[in-house]
């Protein structure tokens, strides 16, 4: 009998053992995870982590998992009523993505020397918005992460919590620059790109 769990386990191990054929691994990964729940996939990944999978394999696994679900979300529209919590969550995620893109766009203008007062104000407004996103982070940390950990899923919350802290640190540095009014284009660009990239990847997890 075909065992999806064993197949996925072997597939994840191939990420490390057969790194030259990552595209084929991704294809197989996408095919099998579409037939499984996120909890099933996360449990298998956690089992492999518990077996002391090499750190580089864990990172590769996370990156491929992220790519797969990005592709899946871009291909499939989630058909639920507007009042459904899933619909609300997807819309919130899209809004965060759009704001992240706007932040990176503003950063690009600054790097190119096209800085205006409206750009500075717009970036300050975007930082205010990201301060509000902190509430969602706290919900995840206080409600979702403990729930996952109680069910034996330790690695996913640890990775997401680390990203929360990275975003907080970058956001704090960018806020200090904007509030002080001393704009260093290269530094603002690097911080903005960093925040945007982590935000964009984080919401797919």
Residue ranges and their predicted role:
Residues 1-205:
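Small-residue-biased structural context
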């Amino acid at each position: 009998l075909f065992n999806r769990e064993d197949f996925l386990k072997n597939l994840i191990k191939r990420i490390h053992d057969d790194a030259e054929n990552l595209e084929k691994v991704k294809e197989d990964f996408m095919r099998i995870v579409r037939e499984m729940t996120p909890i099933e996939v996360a449990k298998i990944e956690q089992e492999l982590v518990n077996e002391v999978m090499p750190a580089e394999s864990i990172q590769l696994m996370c990156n491929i998992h992220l790519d797969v679900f990005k592709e899946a979300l871009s291909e499939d529209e989630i058909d639920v009523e507007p009042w459904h919590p899933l619909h609300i969550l997807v819309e919130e995620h899209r809004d965060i993505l759009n704001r992240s893109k706007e932040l990176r766009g503003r950063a690009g203008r600054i790097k190119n020397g096209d800085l205006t007062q409206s750009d500075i104000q717009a970036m300050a407004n975007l930082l205010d918005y990201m301060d509000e996103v902190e509430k969602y982070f706290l919900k995840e940390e206080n409600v979702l992460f403990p729930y996952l950990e109680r069910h034996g899923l330790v690695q996913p919350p640890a990775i997401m919590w680390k990203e929360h802290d990275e975003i907080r640190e970058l956001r704090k540095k960018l806020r200090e620059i904007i509030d002080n009014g001393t704009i260093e284009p290269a530094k603002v660009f690097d911080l903005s790109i960093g925040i945007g990239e982590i935000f964009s990847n984080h919401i797919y997890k």
